Amino acid sequence: QLIDPVTELRKWCKKIVHVHGKDATIDWDAVRHGGISGAVPFVWHRMPGFGDTNWRDIISILRSNGYEDDICIEGYHDPVYNGELEMTGQLHALNYLKWCRGGEFTPTPWEK
Protein backbone atom coordinates (compact mmCIF):
# COMPACT_ATOMS: atom_id res chain seq x y z
CA GLN A 1 0.00 0.00 0.00
CA LEU A 2 3.09 2.23 0.14
CA ILE A 3 2.26 3.67 3.57
CA ASP A 4 5.19 5.60 5.05
CA PRO A 5 6.30 3.77 8.22
CA VAL A 6 7.95 6.88 9.70
CA THR A 7 4.75 8.93 9.44
CA GLU A 8 2.71 6.12 11.00
CA LEU A 9 5.28 5.61 13.74
CA ARG A 10 5.02 9.25 14.78
CA LYS A 11 1.24 8.83 15.19
CA TRP A 12 1.34 5.57 17.15
CA CYS A 13 4.71 5.58 18.93
CA LYS A 14 3.34 6.04 22.46
CA LYS A 15 1.33 2.82 22.10
CA ILE A 16 4.15 0.58 20.81
CA VAL A 17 5.33 -2.19 23.13
CA HIS A 18 7.14 -4.47 20.63
CA VAL A 19 8.96 -3.83 17.34
CA HIS A 20 9.72 -6.24 14.51
CA GLY A 21 12.62 -5.13 12.32
CA LYS A 22 11.62 -5.68 8.74
CA ASP A 23 12.53 -3.74 5.62
CA ALA A 24 11.31 -3.59 2.04
CA THR A 25 12.74 -2.72 -1.34
CA ILE A 26 10.27 -1.07 -3.72
CA ASP A 27 10.61 -1.53 -7.48
CA TRP A 28 9.40 1.93 -8.49
CA ASP A 29 9.52 1.08 -12.21
CA ALA A 30 7.04 -1.76 -11.60
CA VAL A 31 4.78 0.61 -9.62
CA ARG A 32 4.89 3.25 -12.37
CA HIS A 33 4.03 0.71 -15.06
CA GLY A 34 1.50 -1.50 -13.27
CA GLY A 35 0.59 0.16 -10.01
CA ILE A 36 0.50 -1.74 -6.75
CA SER A 37 -2.15 -4.11 -8.11
CA GLY A 38 -0.25 -4.94 -11.30
CA ALA A 39 0.80 -8.40 -12.42
CA VAL A 40 4.47 -7.72 -11.64
CA PRO A 41 5.65 -7.88 -8.00
CA PHE A 42 6.78 -4.47 -6.78
CA VAL A 43 8.07 -5.16 -3.28
CA TRP A 44 10.62 -7.50 -1.75
CA HIS A 45 10.72 -7.94 2.01
CA ARG A 46 14.25 -7.54 3.29
CA MET A 47 16.18 -7.49 6.53
CA PRO A 48 16.79 -4.06 8.07
CA GLY A 49 19.48 -2.22 6.15
CA PHE A 50 18.81 -3.89 2.81
CA GLY A 51 15.61 -2.03 1.95
CA ASP A 52 14.30 1.50 1.64
CA THR A 53 13.32 2.15 5.28
CA ASN A 54 15.05 4.97 7.16
CA TRP A 55 16.00 3.09 10.32
CA ARG A 56 17.91 6.04 11.80
CA ASP A 57 14.66 8.02 11.89
CA ILE A 58 12.70 5.04 13.22
CA ILE A 59 15.13 4.41 16.08
CA SER A 60 15.31 8.13 16.91
CA ILE A 61 11.51 8.39 17.05
CA LEU A 62 11.23 5.25 19.18
CA ARG A 63 13.91 6.36 21.63
CA SER A 64 12.66 9.94 21.91
CA ASN A 65 9.26 8.53 22.84
CA GLY A 66 10.59 6.27 25.58
CA TYR A 67 10.89 2.93 23.77
CA GLU A 68 13.77 0.99 25.36
CA ASP A 69 13.08 -2.58 24.32
CA ASP A 70 14.44 -4.83 21.59
CA ILE A 71 13.87 -4.81 17.86
CA CYS A 72 13.26 -8.39 16.73
CA ILE A 73 14.90 -8.83 13.32
CA GLU A 74 12.73 -10.65 10.79
CA GLY A 75 14.77 -12.30 8.09
CA TYR A 76 13.25 -15.55 6.92
CA HIS A 77 11.47 -13.81 4.02
CA ASP A 78 14.53 -12.03 2.61
CA PRO A 79 15.05 -13.22 -1.00
CA VAL A 80 18.84 -12.87 -0.76
CA TYR A 81 19.70 -13.79 2.83
CA ASN A 82 17.61 -16.90 3.34
CA GLY A 83 18.35 -20.55 3.95
CA GLU A 84 22.01 -21.03 4.80
CA LEU A 85 22.63 -17.27 4.45
CA GLU A 86 19.92 -16.20 6.91
CA MET A 87 22.27 -15.91 9.90
CA THR A 88 24.70 -13.84 7.82
CA GLY A 89 21.86 -11.47 6.94
CA GLN A 90 20.70 -11.38 10.56
CA LEU A 91 24.18 -10.32 11.71
CA HIS A 92 24.40 -7.65 9.00
CA ALA A 93 20.98 -6.36 10.08
CA LEU A 94 21.97 -6.36 13.76
CA ASN A 95 25.15 -4.39 13.07
CA TYR A 96 23.26 -1.98 10.82
CA LEU A 97 20.62 -1.32 13.51
CA LYS A 98 23.35 -0.77 16.09
CA TRP A 99 24.94 1.77 13.75
CA CYS A 100 21.55 3.47 13.29
CA ARG A 101 21.16 3.93 17.03
CA GLY A 102 24.66 5.40 17.33
CA GLY A 103 26.86 2.36 17.90
CA GLU A 104 27.42 0.14 20.90
CA PHE A 105 25.51 0.97 24.07
CA THR A 106 27.69 2.80 26.58
CA PRO A 107 25.95 3.74 29.84
CA THR A 108 26.43 7.25 31.15
CA PRO A 109 28.42 6.84 34.40
CA TRP A 110 26.37 9.35 36.39
CA GLU A 111 22.98 7.88 35.39
CA LYS A 112 21.36 5.01 37.27
Describe the role of every protein-language-model region.
Residues Q1-K112:
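Histidine-acidic metal/acid-base catalytic patches
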